[in-house]
Amino acid sequence: MSPANTKAFLELHIEQGPVLVARDLPAAIPTVIRGNVRFPYARCLGEYAHSAAVPRGGRKDALLATVELVARLDALWQELEAEGHPDTVFTVGKLYTDAAEHAMTKVPGACCFTLNFGGTSKDVLDRLRDRTYALADEIRAARNVTFALGDCVGSDPTPLDDGLRDRLRTASQALGIPVIEMPTVGHDASIFARAGIPAAMVLVRNQHGSHNAAEAMEMADFGEGAKLLAVTALELAEQ
């Protein structure tokens, strides 16, 4: 597939978040797919010690150092929201000590974790990456530990095609389906858009988010989203 032989890519997907439920709307038209900055294999290394024998000043607690890093990044996330970047997100999906070594009476000597930032602004994502390195260095010096953040990977924010979004808006008005426009998370559409193929999406309202057993969707909402996609696809095919 290439721009030479592919007119457009249209994708239908559940929202995976709470916005459409809160707004009581069946569907949305995404404006941009969030980019991300990720540290998938980060570690903090300290020194294992007896919890009752080592005073605070003599500890090299890898877990407390990691928790401080996470807390300070969370504070930075709040600052960014206050500055007008509500589309920025921050998640620590993994944080754990070594099960073979950890104990209630042992100072943690190692902690593994992940950091995942998302957003619609490359400048903001770059700022988050740079600040992560700076904070890790500050905490390293203060707590006498070492951070090995590992590879930093990610992708830039990907705007979706304006012309296709216009068609979807027109279809929503013609069908009487109320929609909003909003950013979305990583989807197949971003791959096509980065390859130069016009891409757009329709998000369908769903209950209880995603990535959990309570995830749900009303078939009526699925039908509304499918109508938007079908009408737009047929118009493109007839050109």
Language-model features: locations:
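Short amphipathic alpha-helices in soluble, non-transmembrane regions
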Residues: 127-136
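Predominant activation on well-ordered alpha-helical scaffold segments within soluble catalytic domains
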Residues: 40-41, 63-74, 133, 169, ...
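Short catalytic/ligand-gating loop segments at beta-alpha or beta-beta junctions
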Residues: 1, 85-88, 152, 180-185
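Zn-dependent metallopeptidase/amidohydrolase metal-coordination segment
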Residues: 178-231
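Midchain, well-structured core segments that form catalytic/ion-binding scaffolds
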Residues: 1-123
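Glycine/charged-rich beta-loop-alpha catalytic/anionic-binding loops adjacent to active sites
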Residues: 45-51, 175, 207-211
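A short beta-alpha structural unit
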Residues: 89-100, 114-120, 146-165, 190
